[in-house]
């Protein structure tokens, strides 16, 4: 009986030790996005701090609109162990092999407009990081609506930081 209780206590201690660390406190070490420990932890592709809204819109081009997205879901992020002569050849060709960053689906996006200053003589440069603290994305101009779709993909978006 003593052995089973000792084994149980040892097993519980090993489980507690193997658990990942708890979430860091707000503003503490590890609460940022890995780039100088600042910003939102959901932002995977950050943009430079000195980039303006006008520069970001130019990077998106005329076929896409600059958007600020509250939610991003990333699929992928896998490490594959392939065996055999041609193991993993197909997945590496389509870009889903080891180290693939996965597909980012953005949701709850709002358009970021380039505002015209009221005082014409004073140039104002709005920094993109001051306008949007979440995921900054270039969303395709599309008249489609995904409100009643099963999958719900109306506006395909690409993270701005991934194309810089």
UniProtKB/Swiss-Prot annotation:
Aerial growth, conidiation, and dispersal of filamentous fungi in the environment rely upon a capability of their secreting small amphipathic proteins called hydrophobins (HPBs) with low sequence identity. Class I can self-assemble into an outermost layer of rodlet bundles on aerial cell surfaces, conferring cellular hydrophobicity that supports fungal growth, development and dispersal; whereas Class II form highly ordered films at water-air interfaces through intermolecular interactions but contribute nothing to the rodlet structure. This is Class I hydrophobin rodA. GO terms for molecular function: structural constituent of cell wall. Pfam families: Hydrophobin. Glycans are attached at residue 50. Self-assembles to form functional amyloid fibrils called rodlets. Self-assembly into fibrillar rodlets occurs spontaneously at hydrophobic:hydrophilic interfaces and the rodlets further associate laterally to form amphipathic monolayers. Disulfide bonds join 60-138, 68-132, 69-109, 139-157. SMART domains: HYDRO. Induction: Expression is repressed during growth in liquids, whereas several days of growth under aerial conditions of solid culture induces expression. Residues 1-18 form the signal peptide. Its main location: secreted. GO terms for cellular component: extracellular region; fungal-type cell wall. Keywords: Cell wall, Conidiation, Disulfide bond, Glycoprotein, Secreted, Signal, Sporulation.
């Amino acid at each position: 009986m003593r052995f089973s209780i000792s084994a149980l206590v040892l097993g519980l201690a090993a489980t507690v030790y193997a658990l990942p660390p708890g979430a860091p406190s707000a503003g503490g070490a590890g609460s940022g996005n890995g780039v100088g420990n600042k910003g939102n932890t959901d932002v995977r592709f950050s943009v430079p701090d000195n980039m303006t809204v006008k520069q970001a819109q130019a990077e998106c081009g005329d076929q896409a609109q600059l958007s600020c997205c509250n939610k991003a879901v990333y699929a992928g992020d896998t490490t594959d162990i392939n065996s055999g002569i041609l193991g993993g050849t197909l997945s590496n060709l389509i870009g889903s092999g080891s180290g693939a960053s996965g597909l980012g689906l953005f949701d709850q996006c709002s358009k970021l407009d380039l505002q015209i200053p009221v005082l014409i003589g004073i140039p104002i440069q709005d920094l993109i990081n001051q306008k949007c603290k979440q995921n900054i994305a270039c969303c395709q101009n599309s008249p489609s609506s995904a409100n009643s779709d099963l999958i719900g993909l109306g506006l395909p978006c690409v993270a701005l930081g991934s194309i810089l």
